[in-house]
Amino acid sequence: MKETPKKVLVIGSGPIKIAEAAEFDYSGSQALKALKEEGIETVLVNSNVATVQTSKKFADKLYMLPVVWWAVEKVIEKERPDGIMIGFGGQTALNVGVDLHKKGVLQKYGVKVLGTQIDGIEKALSREKFRETMIENNLPVPPSLSARSEEEAIKNAKIVGYPVMVRVSFNLGGRGSMVAWTEEDLKKNIRRALSQSYIGEVLIEKYLYHWIELEYEVMRDKKGNSAVIACIENLDPMGVHTGESTVVAPCQTLDNLEYQNMRTYTIEVARSINLIGECNVQFALNPRGYEYYIIETNPRMSRSSALASKATGYPLAYVSAKLALGYELHEVINKVSGRTCACFEPSLDYIVTKIPRWDLSKFENVDQSLATEMMSVGEVMSIGRSFEESLQKAVRMLDIGEPGVVGGKIYEAKMSKVEALKYLKERRPYWFLYVAKAFKEGATIDEVYEVTGISKFFLNKIKGLVDFYETLKILKEIDEETLKLAKKLGFSDEQISKALNKSTEYVRKIRDQSNIIPVVKLIDTLAGEWPSVTNYMYLTYNGTEDDLEFSQGNKLLMVGAGGFRIGVSVEFDWSVVSLMEAASKYFDEVAVLNYNPETVSTDWDIARKLYFDEINVERVLDLIKKEKFRYVATFSGGQIGNSIAKELEENGVRLLGTSGSSVDIAENREKFSKLLDKLGISQPNWVSATSLEEIKKFVNEVGFPVLVRPSYVLSGSSMKIAYSEEELYEYVRRATEISPKYPVVISKYIENAIEAEVDGVSDGNRVLGITLEHVEEAGVHSGDATMSIPFRKLSENSVNKMRENVLSLARELNIKGPFNVQFVVKDNTPHIIELNLRASRSMPFSSKAKGINLINESMKAIFNGLDFSEDYYEPPSKYWAVKSPQFSWSQLRGTYPFLGPEMKSTGEAASFGVTFYDALLKSWLSSIPNRIPNKNGIALVYGDKNLDYLKDTAVNLVKFGLTVYSISELPLQGIETIDKTKAEELVRAKKVEIVVTDGYLKKFDYNIRRTAVDYNIPVILNGRLGYEVSKAFLDYDSLTFFEISEYGGGI
């Protein structure tokens, strides 16, 4: 019999960070839906302003607060929930739940943990307890010993025997974990590993070099009934974090005995921790025989469970929430099939491939090798009916400029077999591209296996693609059968045209004449054995007929955001879902095209039709041919939609909203600059230089500093502010190729200016706009900036000029829908630096801060016009809202933390307050590892920029109760100094509570910044922000903890 609590508190995961991303927006949203179906009142604590779940329709009450125990206690004290769910917000939520239990908060207020209980969570997440639990239940684990100190770790490593894997307890994304081949390796890194554990514990485990890694997803109810939902095979062997691995489902290389044995072990692991809900179990399999070890389990929804849910069509999060309420598996209906109960295990008649997406080129000094710590910022998932088709589709989905496994930049690069094998041995990201290159250059299967440990089954498949492509290259024409085979192997029109040295139009014409078109197949969880009631689909060339009939009428295709990367994250999924809901009022049918397994937009019950497939011109045209969509919307999914808008329009596609030609003007720097001049709108001086002489001439005219934007990057550092000739020419020489083909854009950098933005909607005549002001000065990328609504330091005169500029642009470009304009304001004069004719990164924040959904307003603007009389309208603010960036420095091994014009943050948090400082502090505290410093601790404050702000920061921190040191090489007037070596020692000894610094000082303070982030010490990288946060510390006791609507926010 199920229990029905009246009110349930759901804990979210906070801002997006590496290893804890949008999968928890998906899982949390599903949990809230499952609770609402039962008539249970829901309360959500989550500071992630960009997510779908922090919209009002999901939870009855929403608290945008730091996801930490003391803030959640305030909510419990006020709301008095009967139950709490901690399994849908990642490791962050589990840690909060354990803390609330240990501190007696749950017991004090009579709050029951729903789902897996705290003792089960501790058994799973403490490496020592997990090992003991497995041994007690006769389940196989690798030889290992736990440790809580450096000395104990070194001693136990000798007992276990090198090489060893160091695993970290109560940890996210493998932070601090490593493979130590020698005692020297271990001594060098063990302190960092212990620092990254929530409970200060690590496991020293025998390293299983080149063993196969596998994952099983299992559901279990309170009666012990279990269903194994998916088996996921990692192509990367042990030693590479599962979040860094390319994976396939279902498993491709297991025989039945291996599969069944591990399936049985999975159910036993779930039983041993008394799981109620869902968990994933990770295994190591010896490729040379029937030998397996259990590695770990996660007793919560995870990245893998989100993937399994999207791969199988089984709604894991929804079912898990129902089980947490006391339902049994046979009582829950699978809403994808609409017929089967949740105890039916999925059966797949297709192959799913997931590939992570990295953005390591944005970070200086970062270690490029894939290892035990997760560094990828997103992932893509493809579906095909052969491994080759699925893999090639996934490669294109990465949006890294590769047309597939073969035929791209790496495949055609000047690279020898030896070089390709070297990159493979180093475990570079996107290894499959180097595997193909190695085969092209003559490597054997055995040679590639030796350096990678990747199963020969998969290597043979990739070699087959290389052989086929090389055969294509010697053809003068392509016959129908060869073209069919190419498409079945996942080759795009672009790849085929490159091989034949023809145009893509030529290949498409032959396809059309021969009727070689993909078919639409349904994902129904049971391989077509039962009819599906949801339209969850993919396209494949390995089939003969469509699984459904296509309706007629007024239909819209929406382009999603694709795989997340730095700059494109969950905020664009919020825009896609918002547009989907708004568009349903204007269209008979709305379909979504997207391929991100983490998101709400790719969930089974969000869209009327979901195409889980590629986002490119070829695929959109295929879908239009089948579905006869009247419009395509490209503006809600970030840059990926804008990048194909013009070509779609050229192919006769009608775009919803602003025209492709207007988008092209906004995206093209020269065209946009001429437009601004025509309208009399100020912009920073700039030049597109094709030689060093042109650069020198421009710099002599405008002076330093200047902002450099190369069009062709060699070193991975795309933009830089140069303060001197030496700095500028050294950067241009080192970082970029300069020529008429690859011009470098140099613009005047306006110092000590305020950066501001307008998020808005236009109907071509009027504008609805929201002004956002940055705390940091101009020069810090808007994605890394702290933002305030309403504005604080801008004058009314400046804001009025900004509004006039925005209105002029909206009318001139006939903007229909959402847009974002970025300004630099100096001496009350706004200068436009950028216009984006699409939904923006900040739009969920500005919408929720003002209580008005800009995407909903966009649809009104497009079809009915904006419904107010003013030319320009900005809704009033009732209270304060502040958005803060979330950085993932600790995950990015070796990189130097600093802020500049290149975006580095992975997510964002926001909070509301009765004052600016109330909102700012809660927002800042929502990003890990930020926390209130312990009084009587030490702060380091130093830098070479914003010196007045740094000095005032130091004064505030002294008032707060800290001992503040500056560094003797960079002294601050009136602040005690210590030398750099002493500062490094204090950080390494974990005696420093907070570091506040400013400027690019890599040669001077690399060790201070890097050690601080490695040891989870809060670091503020801007003097102005440091000043505002230090001032907020002084009012810490005045923080407010209201529900979002009490601040006048929320949508």
Swiss-Prot record:
Superkingdom, natural source: Archaea
GO molecular function, a single term: carbamoyl-phosphate synthase (glutamine-hydrolyzing) activity
UniProt-annotated binding residues for Mg(2+) 4: E834, N836
Pfam family for this entry, one: CPSase_L_D3
Positions that bind ATP 1: R127, R167, G173, G174, K206, L208, E213, G239, V240, H241, Q282, E296
Reaction equation(s) it catalyzes: hydrogencarbonate + L-glutamine + 2 ATP + H2O = carbamoyl phosphate + L-glutamate + 2 ADP + phosphate + 2 H(+)
One GO term describing the cellular component: cytoplasm
Residues engaged in binding Mn(2+) 2: E296, N298
Binding site for Mn(2+) 4: E834, N836
Chain residue ranges for the region called Carbamoyl phosphate synthetic domain: 549-930
Residues that bind Mg(2+) 1: Q282, E296
Protein's job: Large subunit of the glutamine-dependent carbamoyl phosphate synthetase (CPSase). CPSase catalyzes the formation of carbamoyl phosphate from the ammonia moiety of glutamine, carbonate, and phosphate donated by ATP, constituting the first step of 2 biosynthetic pathways, one leading to arginine and/or urea and the other to pyrimidine nucleotides.
HAMAP family: CPSase_L_chain_A (MF_01210_A)
NCBIfam families found in the cross-reference section: CPSaseII_lrg, PRK05294.1, PRK12815.1
Subunit structure: Composed of two chains; the small (or glutamine) chain promotes the hydrolysis of glutamine to ammonia, which is used by the large (or ammonia) chain to synthesize carbamoyl phosphate. Tetramer of heterodimers (alpha,beta)4.
Name of this protein: Carbamoyl phosphate synthase large chain
Gene: carB
